[in-house]
Amino acid sequence: MLAELPQPQNLTLLTLNTQYVLTWDWDQTTTGNSVSFTVEYMAKYKMKMKKKNWSRVCERTTRTRCDLTGSDLHYLGMYVLRVRASADGVDSDWVNKDFCPDIDASLGPPSRAELAPVGNLLDVTISDPLTSTQHSMKEHVLFLYYRILYWSRSDDPQGLKPKVLDSSNNLVTPPELEAWAWYCVMIQSRYDYYNKTSSYTEPQCMQTEGDTPYGQIFLYFLVSMMVCFLLVLLSSYAFFRFYRGLKNTFYPSIQLPAHIQEYLCDSSPGSDMPRLITADSEAELCCDKLTICPEVVLLEIHVPPPLTAPPSELEQDSGRHIRQDSGDSGIYSTEGGSAQQGRSGGEPIRRDQEVDSWQTLEQVKMEEMGRELADERDLDEGVVDVCV
């Protein structure tokens, strides 16, 4: 005869809105790890029928819990849940538990809460708790309402006394709020028929608004004027710098020297356009050094002896020298010619006149030689580069 298998103990339901999970306890020391469990349910009104038709949810599971959310249990229905253990072909007795979602299921908080300032008030928008199929719980709980706790954040936390506001609406505006103050809000779902209450939502804080003070308006205006002034000043300074740079680039204050401007500008009168490069200027320029040397002329100076009257031979020599020097000076040739003409004409010439004429010619000749020597020194020092 097989030993009896003990039953599961402490059947408990974990619920929230329409989510249901059945849990139980089991002593692992009795059978080890080979035990399995089976969970079934049936509507309670069918228990009086002779033929009972149980719906199986979990079969031979090794876990000590079973999720009934997908069984589509009606929220207002009453059901009987049962669990048994099985090990080595031996089944334990069934353990039953009654379950009514409307009575036993916990109520969840609002799925979402939002705050929005409206003047010196706050609008609180509340979203209903949701079922497992994402529908509102108000479809199952008709008298569902919300309790709203709100308080000023500037209050002393030690002596905090929040104000309470109950409403079944999804949009609530707490009264008697101050302008430009911070308020915090927490919301709870409630169902008084079965005394169901949810947990509160996380605190949310928002600042109220109101009429803008005149001092604040004046401050905004002053700041705006300062910003505009700075923008205009910066724009003007940037434009001035740009204009100055452009002017200095195209119209510099320092002008080029006149000889460079003559080279850059067109040679035609009244033209300010730069002279274009011609084809001749592109040719290669070759320069050679050219030295100009004057022609060397040998001069002869004949000093007559200190005689009171020159002899006849000296008269002839003087005429000859005058004729030789006629190629160098027009004055000499003229004087010499006049002397010859005088002799050829047979006119008598006095000795004292000839001596004076000869001395005058020698003095003129010496002065001409001095000028020529000075010109020779200047020519020797000058060197000119000639482009070929």
UniProtKB/Swiss-Prot annotation:
Belongs to the type II cytokine receptor family. Together with IFNAR2, forms the heterodimeric receptor for type I interferons (including interferons alpha, beta, epsilon, omega and kappa). Type I interferon binding activates the JAK-STAT signaling cascade, resulting in transcriptional activation or repression of interferon-regulated genes that encode the effectors of the interferon response. Mechanistically, type I interferon-binding brings the IFNAR1 and IFNAR2 subunits into close proximity with one another, driving their associated Janus kinases (JAKs) (TYK2 bound to IFNAR1 and JAK1 bound to IFNAR2) to cross-phosphorylate one another. It is a single-pass membrane protein. The chain crosses the membrane at residues 217-237. It comes from the Eukaryota. Keywords: Cell membrane, Cytoplasm, Membrane, Receptor, Repeat, Transmembrane, Transmembrane helix. Residues 308-357 are annotated as: Disordered. This is Interferon alpha/beta receptor 1b. Residues 331-342 have a biased composition (Polar residues). It holds the Pfam family Tissue_fac. GO terms for molecular function: type I interferon receptor activity. Residues 5-102, 109-211 form the Fibronectin type-III domain. The gene is ifnar1b. SUPFAM superfamilies: Fibronectin type III. One of its GO terms (biological process) is positive regulation of protein phosphorylation. Heterodimer with IFNAR2; forming the receptor for type I interferon. One of its GO terms (cellular component) is perinuclear region of cytoplasm. Induction: In the fibroblastic RTG-2 cell line, induced by polyinosine-polycytidylic acid (poly(I:C)), a synthetic analog of dsRNA, that binds TLR3.
